[in-house]
Regions:
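Intrinsically disordered, low-complexity, compositionally biased regions/tails
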Residues: 17, 149, 170, 218, ...
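Secreted, short cysteine-rich peptides and small extracellular cysteine-rich domains stabilized by multiple disulfide
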Residues: 184-230
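Positively charged n-region of N-terminal signal peptides that target proteins for export
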Residues: 2-8, 25
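N-terminal propeptides/leader regions of secreted preproproteins
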Residues: 24-184
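C-terminal motif of bacterial Sec signal peptides marking the signal peptidase cleavage site
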Residues: 19-22
């Protein structure tokens, strides 16, 4: 009996410890550097994780990224797949450009794990992701002549884009189009990114901000801890 009681106390204690650490981990996840936005997301997690992709595209612009960070892996994949479909269908591309975009689309359809933040990826997944992105970006820049601004509009934001006169305009949820001024947003880049910076042609400057759970870099795979310099 004494052995059974000790075993029961051990199991209860272990479960309590695991619960404590899981709560600690949840509390240490930041969906936004803005405390009010972060609190709102945490209060609405259950409804956010039922949100459809079309609804995400239409929510307030300032909440898009915090909500995206709270999405399940399947939701994130759906957002990027729809964004890439829209990029291919609603803009004019040369055949080789469409093929290159399709390559990214196909890869993402098979590798939803690539949308896990880089710091949380399994080593073999991170290695495969790095190899693919390096090759994909190199071909886009050297063979297709795509600018950093165009690449940032395609893989640096999940928002839809419209290309006019060679300039990629990002479509905002308020119906306006424009070149995104990243310095207007809180914590919009990763200062130690190893694959791709969302700053396009500028540098990411570290600032006092809690690192968020993804949302920056190539397909939002980096956390955000800084601001793009002008």
């Amino acid at each position: 009996v004494e052995f059974i009681m000790k075993k029961s106390f051990f199991i209860v204690g272990l479960l309590s410890l695991l619960t404590f650490f899981s709560c600690q981990n949840e509390e240490n996840v930041y969906y936004s550097c803005d405390e009010a936005e972060d609190a709102w997301v945490k209060e609405n997690l259950s409804s956010i994780r039922k949100m459809e992709t079309t609804e995400w595209f239409s929510i307030s612009e300032k909440l898009k990224l915090p909500v995206y960070r709270a999405f399940s892996l399947e939701q994130k994949q759906s957002v990027w797949m729809e964004k890439l479909e829209d990029v291919m269908m609603n803009n004019e591309w040369k055949t080789e450009e469409i093929e290159h975009l399709q390559q990214l689309y196909d890869a993402l359809s098979m590798h939803s794990e690539w949308l896990i933040p880089n710091t949380e990826k399994a080593e073999e997944d991170f290695d495969a992701f790095k190899i693919f992105t390096y090759k994909w970006l190199a071909f886009a820049q050297k063979e297709l002549g795509w600018s950093n601004d165009l690449l940032s509009a395609i893989v640096g934001t999940a928002n839809r884009i419209k290309i006019m006169n060679g300039i990629a305009l990002i479509e905002f949820s308020n119906g306006l189009n424009g070149v995104k001024n990243r310095s207007e947003f809180t914590c919009n880049c990763n200062s130690s990114n190893v694959i791709w910076t969302t700053c396009s042609t500028s540098n990411c400057i570290t600032r006092s901000c809690s690192t968020t759970n993804g949302g920056c870099g190539f397909l939002g795979s980096d956390g955000c801890d800084g601001l793009c310099s002008k």
